[in-house]
């Protein structure tokens, strides 16, 4: 999925995102709203990922859910 697809399909994939990253709350997911930078920031703060690791995790997720 590309950026536009993620943002457009956010309501449909929120559950999949929450399954993978269970520390994300419903409020977090609403705040993120499919926006890449918001997602990366949450992964960094909740999981202690470096920026590079968060980017890799998010890219891997997108590639898996095309």
Swiss-Prot record:
SUPFAM superfamilies: Hypothetical protein YjbJ. Pfam families: CsbD. It comes from the Bacteria. Belongs to the UPF0337 (CsbD) family. This is UPF0337 protein pc0632. The lineage of its organism: Bacteria, Pseudomonadati, Chlamydiota, Chlamydiia, Parachlamydiales.
């Amino acid at each position: 999925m590309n950026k536009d697809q993620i943002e457009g399909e956010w309501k449909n994939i929120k559950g999949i995102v929450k399954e993978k990253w269970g520390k994300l709350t419903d409020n977090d997911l609403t705040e993120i709203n499919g926006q890449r930078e918001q997602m990366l920031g949450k992964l960094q703060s909740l999981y202690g990922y470096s920026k590079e690791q968060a980017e890799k995790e998010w890219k891997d997720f997108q590639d898996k859910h095309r």
